């Protein structure tokens, strides 16, 4: 009995430090929101202006790593001795479906507006040149480059899972080949795990902070319920209670079904927007944008704007590269777990093709629709953002479509389900990472899952209370800094161990 308690109990050294750190930061923020915003702006400016170049070089180096994996000595190595667990079609679909979160729907619908209103390269706002580059930059930020950079971590985790047969629930477990077992299981490994967990908590709170206003704005549009911070807090509380009920009553199968419904509904909604918005324009705009991407790719890769100091690469490229860095471990573990039996080359190509198709389709359809609505003066996004906030502007891009009531119901259900599955995934991932010896496939303790879902919910509410996108962007960038080094260490650990143990 004692052994069972030990197995399912919390791991104090990785449970309490993140809890205390995040709790203190939330308390300090709530005490003085104005002072918190000043600090947030200072942190954002420092990291993006002083260290933005490091994130850009990280992505470029990891891109070269993708080519090394695809064409190097490990390209034909198989990740495990078993045949692939899923058919190729199912495998690609699972990767495709993993990109349909509410946060992705948020950025896909509004991102292009920011690119054309505050464009890069000194272009005039809302000019023809700005509009030509608008979607191209979305394809850059959400295309082959970031997915290729995930390859190293995905291959690394798949190698540790299926070749080395390691139980990996925290990144420190993978660092034994690099720093030795003493350091990986000692203070150094504990620090690494705490960096990972604090960053992950803020990332998940950020996603919740993006998703919640979409749901509450839908409720205002459909039911006339005014969107307030109190309503946001009530909705987040309802999600936490619903997640608790699902876990306590063993309804995890229902959550998985909801995840599948989310995927199919997202395809249906995207198909609807594609048809009624203007399929011909969308395809033409996409084709032109791919050409613009190829033409400007070298400059996009290394654009830091140190002379004109317009702020575009700091506000967007560095922010998104930090976004990719902060989610890299969690996403790579998922991609690795569904890729057992694949070769390294298959995994690398599958990620770039399957995941790029997902994000490119979503950004092309939603971004093109937003641009059409702006060009036709159907909606005034600047006024909507100034008066009501970004979420209202996003809702209006959907409400402007034909059969608006049916469309809004579909979008409301999609966002609600996406956030339910988000809260469930947040609580599960954090609980697994902070409990002692909970193995894959086992359920972590209920109270631990509830506790983490409550904390993530609090972070979402705090970010919403601060208002605007800058706090959300800063939370991602601040969290991305320590994981920048953690990701590199996991990659180097894989390379070192593979050279010694993955020979013919």
Curated annotation (Swiss-Prot):
Which reactions does this protein catalyse? Answer: 4-(trimethylamino)butanoate(in) + (R)-carnitine(out) = 4-(trimethylamino)butanoate(out) + (R)-carnitine(in)
Q: Does the keyword Iron apply?
A: no
Q: Which UniProt keywords apply?
A: Antiport, Cell inner membrane, Cell membrane, Membrane, Transmembrane, Transmembrane helix, Transport
Q: Which intervals of the chain form a coiled coil? A: none
Give the residue range of the signal peptide: none
Q: Which residues cross the membrane?
A: 10-30, 51-71, 92-112, 143-163, 195-215, 231-251, 263-283, 316-336, 347-367, 398-418, 446-466, 475-495
Looking up InterPro entries in the UniProt record yields: BCCT_CS (IPR018093), BCCT_transptr (IPR000060), BCCT_transptr_CaiT (IPR023449)
Compartments it resides in: Cell inner membrane
In which pathway does this enzyme or protein participate?
A: Amine and polyamine metabolism; carnitine metabolism
Record's GO cellular component terms: plasma membrane
Extract the Pfam families matched here.
BCCT
Q: Which GO terms describe its biological process?
A: 4-(trimethylammonio)butanoate transport; carnitine metabolic process
Annotated GO molecular function terms are: (R)-carnitine:4-(trimethylammonio)butanoate antiporter activity
Provide the topology term for how it sits in the membrane: Multi-pass membrane protein
Instruction: Report the main location listed first in the record.
Output: membrane
Superkingdom is Bacteria
Mind telling me which HAMAP family this protein's record contains?
CaiT
The entry sums up its family as follows:
Belongs to the BCCT transporter (TC 2.A.15) family. CaiT subfamily.
Oligomeric state and interaction partners are given as: Homotrimer.
Q: What does this protein do?
A: Catalyzes the exchange of L-carnitine for gamma-butyrobetaine.
What name appears for this protein in its UniProt entry? L-carnitine/gamma-butyrobetaine antiporter
Originating organism: Escherichia coli O81 (strain ED1a)
